[in-house]
């Protein structure tokens, strides 16, 4: 048996990428839709979170889904996994604690996932007992430090801090947090906040809602998130109304930011902006200028748009945006805008671009070739590129050595239809599935990158020979139903520097059998934790 510690395997792993330095502008975002057809347990996403390791965790009704960058897996709770919370009236709320647990609250109940095993905890009560807490738990919270707090009766207990605070009898405790590791804040359903010294437990101050009408109007649910020297709070009404407020810890005053005639569902910060999911798309609040922007239509591929509610909105470690909807799937927008613009034949722009392309096509574009050749292109170096049924052929000198580029070199498809050279003398080819970019440096092809339907490239064949470089540096290619236009200089990968990666292994097979934690294979346990958390893998060898 061999023990492999601190694995650095890439061929066996599905990788999650690290932080990128390029960000998509909000108006340029294009979304990809994931749903049950992609492996999710359902077509709606109630909550979405990015773990510290970079993995996405999505709750659908009755399930927890994990996404590893290429596929979904989900786990299902059993009846005995559910713990009743008599004082929680809200909807789905996902929380992480400091003990590698994921907690999911929803309407008077909570479940717990052990992230080290990626399984539901059999009995939630056992977690409380392990933390030394034996009283019944009526509601559960986590603070900014991921410390657990349990409401039992009229007392809030810190399961990690070992502190306790009396709560008001005349108001519903809806949220809590800790400011600057020294002030305990209790947020109530009537819009008030009470502050206590975290260490001594002494009362510091209380601030109520601005008016009694406001206090009663938005009493249905509360969601609080820290920002600098204060807290943003969403308060929803039983009717379709909501208010966003900010509490300044220095002035100890509330400020109303916005009120809407529908529910606000989530908050996330990115690039000095506050993003809020709502019943009609999402809002962006500029924290520097106080400007507000409402995004009601979400752009999809092929010039389509979606109007939907947004239950949850988060950003991953790369800066990609994830949106959870009630019934229309999980939406993802890349951290950089798609450079591909497509125009269908019913769009007047398609005729415009066809005419521009037609004027700049080489004479070889119009020739009819016999199989297995679709097109031949001569670049500025005198190299001859041949688009074939079986790949892309390069001949640098007549009668010289030939090089064939296929799927093993980075093409997604080997039926090549058209070829064009950009202003920097790189080569772009259109295939029956995707557009590929061949980077050329020091008189050689250094790498190949391919773009497909997820990048807004039409998922269809392209027309033989129909590709041209325009005078402004853009490239036009013709597919069966679209004109595709893009600027090579707008691509995030034009920089030669590599982005930092944060690989995470999520699956391993032994003799074709998927390995699970604590599951024996040929008489011994290979991993004792979930693959994504494993630091040792034990396998037999000859």
Predicted regions and their residues:
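Residue-level "micro-hotspots" composed of small/polar
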Residues: 24-52, 56, 70, 77-91, ...
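Residue-level detector of Asp-centered blade-edge/turn motifs that repeat once per structural unit
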Residues: 50-53, 96-99, 142-145, 178-181, ...
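Conserved beta-propeller blade signature
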Residues: 55-57, 101-103, 147-149, 183-186, ...
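Loop/turn residues immediately N-terminal
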Residues: 62-65, 70, 107-111, 153-157, ...
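Asp-box/WD-like beta-propeller blade repeats and closely related beta-sheet repeat scaffolds
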Residues: 109, 117-139
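Solenoidal tandem-repeat scaffolds enriched in leucines and small polar residues
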Residues: 138-139, 148-157, 168-180, 184-192, ...
